[in-house]
């Protein structure tokens, strides 16, 4: 996480704004540890952290070679060690050029490469230590209702369950973050209107409800076989499939009307999101391929584009990169749930990764995708100029997310999988809030 902290600090405006305060290296304008201004504090903090992190990388390499780590782990750590001095030299040129674009880009790319090497080494080390160990005995499959407020009348609660409201808060946050980022692209005198926000988020809630309802109808036979889902409204006939389908159509039409009131492209993306989740993911991917989780991440990524397009009327780089963060986060998030309910998914006939590739490989891929998510969050900061709040959030919550993934390797039971699952929600939720606050408030 030391390397990651340096990456984030270098990519956010907290360091970019400080670059002009110190255009020499290794000293700062002929002085050592001159801390007369906040910019200089940031610069020296970055350089001190770089030195300490370099020592940590050296220590990791020595440890890998002296403890008999596997060849691939030694190779990955040695690669990080070899790249680090190159990164320092590029960083020096970046400082002396006041953050000129070519040096900044190379500096960021090398940093991501070092971080990726260390993440891969971590995943392989954990796999070597725990991959051959049996998982803890899973407790009996927990039964619970999928969604809804138990105080609601039965039929109302059943229709609320169809809409999968637990998905709404996070996906609406994704759209909200997309709108916040896009608002920074508006010209002088333009601002994000309340009508755009209400229509976009309202359309998002309705489209999520439509997609969830169609999913209930289309997966009712599989849901009946799974302890986690065999009490869903369509399975238990509280709502007949025909009524649920009609409800989904009404929600879908209403969502498209809300999106169309914003602009036509937003409506097109909304329709794409509904169709992708309901047809491509539910009918084609999930029952047939272990890669359904990865490819299906596109469904969760589309709200980022919807939010951006609602404000600007066109797809932009910031929206695409935010969508990429969500896409890469999805496997790191959902694989935890797939582990927790592996036997249930197997009974339902879904060839998810834990079912067909095993739990050890799934845990390893969680670490891979956490690393990819964190790296993409750095790219988002670099391209959109997000500041210190965003930087602190992705570093601190990213460390928490990674910590629980490591614990999952050690403990290998449902409780650990669900802790990692909730940590993934906390990371993304806080990151999106930080995007909104950093863009709109700070």
UniProtKB/Swiss-Prot annotation:
Disulfide pairings: none
Protein name: Protoheme IX farnesyltransferase
Keyword Phosphoprotein tagged: no
Source organism per UniProt: Halobacterium salinarum (strain ATCC 700922 / JCM 11081 / NRC-1) (Halobacterium halobium)
Positions of transmembrane segments: 49-69, 76-96, 106-126, 167-187, 194-214, 245-265, 267-287, 308-328, 365-385, 386-406, 421-441
Pathway info: Porphyrin-containing compound metabolism; heme O biosynthesis; heme O from protoheme: step 1/1
Signal peptide (from-to): none
GO-annotated cellular components: plasma membrane
The keyword Cell membrane appears for this protein: yes
Keywords: Cell membrane, Heme biosynthesis, Membrane, Transferase, Transmembrane, Transmembrane helix
Region (Unknown): 1-167
Family per similarity comment: In the C-terminal section; belongs to the UbiA prenyltransferase family. Protoheme IX farnesyltransferase subfamily.
Principal EC category: transferase
Domain of life where this protein originates: Archaea
Pfam families for this protein: UbiA
Matching InterPro entries: Protohaem_IX_farnesylTrfase, UbiA_prenyltransferase, UbiA_sf
Function: Converts heme B (protoheme IX) to heme O by substitution of the vinyl group on carbon 2 of heme B porphyrin ring with a hydroxyethyl farnesyl side group.
GO BP, sorted A to Z: heme biosynthetic process; heme O biosynthetic process
């Amino acid at each position: 996480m030391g390397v990651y902290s340096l990456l984030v600090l270098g990519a956010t405006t907290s360091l970019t704004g400080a670059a002009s305060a110190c255009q020499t290296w290794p000293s700062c304008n002929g002085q050592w540890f001159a801390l007369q201004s906040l910019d200089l504090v940031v610069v020296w903090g970055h350089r001190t952290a770089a030195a300490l992190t370099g020592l940590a990388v050296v220590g990791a390499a020595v440890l890998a070679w002296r403890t008999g780590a596997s060849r691939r782990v030694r190779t990955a750590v040695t690669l990080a060690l070899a790249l680090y001095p190159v990164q320092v030299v590029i960083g020096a040129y970046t400082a002396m050029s006041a953050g000129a674009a070519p040096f900044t880009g190379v500096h960021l790319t090398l940093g991501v490469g070092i971080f990726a090497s260390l993440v891969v080494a971590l995943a392989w080390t954990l796999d070597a230590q725990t991959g051959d160990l049996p998982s803890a005995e899973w407790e009996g499959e927990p039964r619970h209702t999928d969604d809804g407020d138990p105080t609601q009348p039965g039929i109302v609660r059943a229709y609320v369950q169809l809409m999968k409201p637990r998905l709404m808060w996070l996906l609406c946050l994704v759209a909200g973050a997309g709108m916040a980022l896009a608002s920074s692209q508006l010209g002088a005198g333009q601002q994000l209107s309340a009508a755009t926000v209400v229509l976009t988020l309202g359309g998002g809630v309705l489209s999520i409800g439509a997609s969830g309802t169609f999913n209930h109808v289309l997966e009712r036979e599989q849901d009946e076989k799974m302890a986690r889902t065999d009490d869903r409204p369509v399975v238990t006939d509280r709502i007949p499939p025909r009524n649920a389908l009609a409800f989904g159509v009404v929600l879908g039409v209403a969502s498209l009307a809300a999106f169309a009131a914003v602009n036509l492209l937003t409506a097109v993306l909304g329709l794409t999101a509904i169709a992708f989740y309901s047809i491509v993911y539910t009918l084609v991917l999930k029952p047939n391929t272990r890669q359904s989780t990865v490819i299906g991440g596109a469904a969760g990524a589309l709200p980022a584009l919807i939010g951006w397009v609602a404000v600007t009327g066109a797809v932009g780089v910031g929206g695409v990169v935010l969508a990429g963060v969500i896409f890469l986060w999805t496997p790191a998030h959902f694989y935890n749930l797939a582990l927790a309910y592996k036997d249930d998914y197997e009974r339902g006939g879904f060839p998810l990764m834990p079912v067909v590739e095993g739990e050890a490989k799934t845990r390893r891929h969680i670490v891979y995708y956490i690393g990819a998510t964190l790296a993409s969050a750095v790219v988002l900061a670099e391209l959109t100029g997000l500041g210190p709040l965003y930087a602190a959030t992705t570093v601190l919550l990213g460390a928490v997310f990674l910590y629980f993934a490591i614990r999952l390797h050690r403990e290998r039971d449902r409780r650990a999988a669900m802790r990692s699952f909730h940590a993934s929600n906390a990371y993304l939720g806080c990151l999106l809030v930080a995007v909104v606050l950093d863009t709109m408030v700070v």
